[in-house]
Regions:
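Bacterial N-terminal signal peptides
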Residues: 9-20
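Acidic/polar surface patches and capping/hinge elements
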Residues: 24-133
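Bacterial N-terminal signal peptides that target proteins for export
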Residues: 1-11
C-alpha cells in the first residue's frame, strides 16, 4: 500500500466517524469528535513523535469506527474480525442502539488512549482529561 492510500484510509475513517455519526450533548459534537479533541490535546502535551502520533490517531479512528460498526446492521468493522488473531461474529443487538454505540466508542477510545499515553510526561493531566469524558 502506498503512502497516499494510507492517508486516504485515515481521512476516510476520520470523516465517517465525525460527519456521519449522530451528534450527542457534548457541546453539539459527536462523541468521536470529543475523543479526537482529547487525543489531540494529549499529543500536544506529549513528546514530539509525529509518526507515533499519526499511528495513534489512525488506531483511535479505527477503534471508534469498529465500536460504532458493531451496532450497525450494514456496516463492516475495519479491523475487528478481519485478521486471524481477532475473530469476531456480529450479533443482532436489541435495545438502545445509539447509547450502546456511544458507550462502546468511549470504552474503545479510553482504553486505547490510556494505554498509548501511559508513559507521557503529563500522564496525570492526560488521564484526567480522558476521565472527564
Amino acid at each position: 500500500m502506498n503512502k497516499y492510500a494510507s492517508v486516504f484510509h485515515f481521512f476516510s475513517l476520520f470523516l465517517i466517524i465525525n460527519l456521519i455519526y449522530p451528534s450527542v450533548s457534548l457541546g453539539g459534537h459527536s462523541v468521536a469528535r470529543s475523543w479526537n479533541e482529547v487525543a489531540l490535546e494529549a499529543i500536544r502535551k506529549d513528546f514530539a513523535r509525529p509518526v507515533v502520533h499519526a499511528r495513534n490517531l489512525f488506531h483511535l479512528s479505527v477503534a471508534m469506527y469498529d465500536a460504532w460498526a458493531f451496532y450497525d446492521s450494514v456496516s463492516t468493522p475495519y479491523l475487528t474480525g478481519r485478521i486471524a488473531e481477532c475473530s469476531f461474529q456480529k450479533v443482532d443487538f436489541e435495545g438502545e442502539k445509539e447509547s450502546a454505540q456511544i458507550e462502546a466508542i468511549s470504552f474503545a477510545a479510553y482504553r486505547l488512549l490510556s494505554h498509548r499515553f501511559s508513559q507521557s510526561p503529563n500522564v496525570i493531566q492526560t488521564i484526567t482529561s480522558f476521565d472527564s469524558l
